[in-house]
């Protein structure tokens, strides 16, 4: 495996550390038959607003006429679109449901809001673009590429403060 020290994208405070995505995030793949979850809400990439982390209105698995296996996800997991990832379609699931197989349900040991904000960031997406640079067809990030991405990890209290601060600023912006 490559050495993190050779890849550090920017400086971080001494109390923080760098980690690879896979060491703090589990891609919680759990493909299920949609007919067994007909009344669950369904999230597809189209249900997530670009670059904001906002969930748009969703319909049930039955209403969306889902026929192929989808991932069962749980409230609090981050749903991340692996198709055209530079559109930055990611959201914290506000409920248990099913998501398209074109998405990854992510389970993390980090503060979920902190991870979401980092996944939506330019720093993360520059690494995504670099990881996918050899792809010529449909832009898509696979698990191996995603797992190698670096994440700056502040202490948990700072993660919470960062997430809270960003949410507060976004709330003020929304009022403008």
Question: Across the structure, where does each feature detected by a protein language model lie?
Answer:
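Structured core elements
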Residues: 11, 20, 72, 78-82, ...
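Short, glycine-/Ser/Thr-/acidic-enriched flexible segments
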Residues: 17, 26, 48-50, 85-86, ...
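Non-catalytic DNA-recognition/assembly elements of restriction-modification systems
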Residues: 2-32, 152, 156-176
